[in-house]
Amino acid sequence: MKTTPNEKLLKKALHSCNNKKYADKILHQEKEIFDLKQLLQISKSLNSVLEFDRLIEAILYIVMAQLKTLGAAIFTKKSFDDNLFVLNRDHYGFDIIRDAQYSINVDHPLINFLDKSDSGCTPDEISKNIKTDKIVKDLFSLSPSFFVPLKAKNRMIGFLLLGEKMESSHQFTDYEKNIIENIASLAAIAINNSQLLEMTTTDIMTHLKLKHYFFTLLMEHLYTINSSGEKKETLSILMIDIDFFKNINDTYGHAAGDIVLEEVAKIIKSCTRNADTAARYGGEEFIVMLNNTSASAAMAVAERIRKSVEEKSIMYDGKKINVTISIGVSSYNFDLESAKSIVERADKALYESKQNGRNRVTLSKNNLPKA
């Protein structure tokens, strides 16, 4: 039977349509393969970063790049036993209102609602399901487009806020929501691992790093400096000891001594940067690594800590306790010095501070200007 011209056109149209469907299917599968490869790279990238602040920053950049949003922010607990999810100081694309409350209790209805969701929800979906109290309104004031729960081991460890999408459509497709869920899952596992590391490397009383972890970080930094081949970056060490600490324990009791340790640790933390590392060295001794800090700058930091402790009145059981500290300072001299050596020099300088009357800062002789 002869094929009519109309039938030929119809067959051609069907063939063209089938080709387009086939091409669209191939494109979609190629995109899925590409996205899976991206998720693998994201997993490798996040699992290679254990330091919490750097990890949060990495997650935010990844989220904004992969999901094409104009903003991203993360709410996490400050510690495992905390009852609040707090907005991390690193966030992008959101206008922060000074008087707004950017923290939320773990028992809040919003948290319970997010916990039941896997791929997240929009502000409209939240408004329809829970009462929008002041806390929720403060979060909505940031104009987020999407809330994403962060879950690790069936436990919610925080949530992610996404800003506006770069593209014209403000709604995430089901496919995009699946990508969001996968990225959130990887981010949650990385955050959980980072928090576990924080727990195992942090002194419970002072919330400073433990001695063994401090030395690990110090050796890593020295290796980085020596590997660069350029003498552009250095570091300095502070060894700090509370003067007459035994007398405090004998006079006021060990509970008072613990309070003194906590307060001195807080001062050390407040006088140093996030890039620096403070640790409890043992007993009433502390150690600080000041990154990219010269000997003269380290002396200024040490003096600031010493003066702050001297001026602080620590209250215990209605009594004021005034303490002083002695500090030794050493700075790396680019001579392939070991971690042990630079710490020993700071310790010797601390001993000199003790011998010369306490409540003072002494620089290691190796770092003194040559005559």
Curated annotation (Swiss-Prot):
EC number, as in UniProt: 2.7.7.65
One CC-aspect GO term: cytoplasm
Annotated site, Transition state stabilizer, chain positions: 246
Location of the GGDEF domain: 233-366
Textual note on the cofactor: Shows higher activity with Mn(2+) than Mg(2+).
Residues at the active site: 284
MF-aspect GO terms: diguanylate cyclase activity; GTP binding; metal ion binding
Domain of life: Bacteria
Regulation: Allosterically regulated by a feedback inhibition loop.
UniProt cross-references to Gene3D superfamilies, sorted A to Z: 3.30.450.40, 3.30.70.270
Biological processes, Gene Ontology terms: cell adhesion involved in single-species biofilm formation; negative regulation of bacterial-type flagellum-dependent cell motility
Keyword entries, A-Z: Allosteric enzyme, Cytoplasm, GTP-binding, Magnesium, Manganese, Metal-binding, Nucleotide-binding, Transferase
Reaction(s) catalysed (UniProt annotation): 2 GTP = 3',3'-c-di-GMP + 2 diphosphate
Cofactor: Mg(2+); Mn(2+)
Enzyme superclass (EC): transferase
Subunit structure: Exists as a homodimer and as larger aggregates. Both dimers and aggregates possess DGC activity.
Function: Catalyzes the conversion of GTP to cyclic-di-GMP (c-di-GMP). Shows activity under aerobic and anaerobic reaction conditions.
UniProt xrefs under NCBIfam families: dguan_cyc_DgcA (NF041606), GGDEF (TIGR00254)
The name this protein goes by in its record: Diguanylate cyclase A
Recorded name of the encoding gene: dgcA
